[in-house]
């Protein structure tokens, strides 16, 4: 079943249609807040807030579905293009401040622009291959869920490997989490309140994506809280020493 039918088909009532459209707008707002906050904290902390592989993957997905396989829905096109531009800013921060994060790996430190070029090109090829395999409109949805899991996994891995919250914040995490929750609820509503609901929203694979996403992002929030609390304790101890 083509997921775009579920995303754009009329629903059983105007009230349900209003709720679904509101959730879609809230998703866009939440992700915009997350990306803008990520860019802000990247420059403030002189680092980057998105791990390299998820960043390459997101930029590639947004490029493919903004400029190659453009969705017919104007709102979605604008949304994807905005996210693409914001992620370019985050990538610039990663290149600019790479020396702060990759002192232990000079090969990466010196070649980050090349790594981004190869990584984004490879991811674009992968998204185009999936679109050619199953069709761009279906690939749009499934690859987006894949991007979400890669992003959540990368964010958690980066937080744990750094042992620091630099480049991140509760705003970045919570707006990212809520953005995905809003779109999942919207899709569920469109599935339930459409007379001939498609099979994909209730598929085992989609349910697996949702379950793993919640596990990863709540784990991230839990770890972020404990690491940030320890940072505040250390900062307070340093201030006491200076007195």
Curated annotation (Swiss-Prot):
Pathway: Secondary metabolite biosynthesis; terpenoid biosynthesis. The chain crosses the membrane at residues 20-42, 51-71, 75-95, 112-132, 138-160, 169-189, 205-225. It catalyses: (3R)-[(10S)-11-epoxyfarnesyl]-2,3,5-trimethyl-6-oxido-4-oxocyclohexa-1,5-diene-1-carboxylate + H(+) = asnovolin H. It holds the Pfam family Pyr4-TMTC. Disruption phenotype: Completely abolishes the production of novofumigatonin and asnovolin A. It is found in: Membrane. This is Asnovolin H synthase nvfL. It comes from Aspergillus novofumigatus (strain IBT 16806). The lineage of its organism: Eukaryota, Fungi, Dikarya, Ascomycota, Pezizomycotina.
């Amino acid at each position: 079943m083509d997921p775009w039918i579920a995303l754009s088909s009329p629903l059983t009532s105007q009230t349900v249609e209003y709720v679904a459209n509101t959730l879609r707008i809230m998703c866009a707002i939440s992700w915009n807040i997350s990306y803008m906050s990520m860019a802000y904290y990247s420059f403030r902390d002189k680092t980057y807030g998105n791990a390299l592989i998820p960043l390459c993957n997101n930029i590639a997905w947004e490029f493919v579905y903004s400029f190659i396989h453009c969705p017919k829905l104007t709102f979605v096109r604008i949304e994807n293009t905005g996210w693409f531009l914001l992620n370019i800013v985050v990538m610039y921060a990663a290149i600019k401040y790479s020396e702060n994060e990759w002192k232990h790996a000079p090969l990466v430190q010196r070649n980050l622009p090349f790594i981004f070029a190869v990584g984004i090109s490879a991811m674009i090829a992968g998204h185009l291959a999936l679109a050619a395999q199953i069709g761009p409109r279906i690939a749009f949805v499934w690859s987006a869920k894949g991007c979400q899991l890669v992003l959540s996994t990368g964010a958690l891995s980066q937080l744990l490997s750094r042992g620091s919250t630099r480049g991140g914040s509760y705003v970045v995490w919570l707006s990212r989490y809520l953005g995905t929750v809003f779109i999942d609820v919207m899709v569920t509503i469109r599935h339930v309140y459409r007379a001939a609901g498609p099979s994909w929203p209730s598929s085992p694979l989609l349910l697996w994506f949702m379950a793993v996403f919640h596990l990863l992002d709540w784990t991230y929030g839990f770890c972020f809280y404990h690491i940030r609390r320890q940072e505040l304790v250390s900062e307070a101890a340093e201030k006491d020493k200076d007195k």
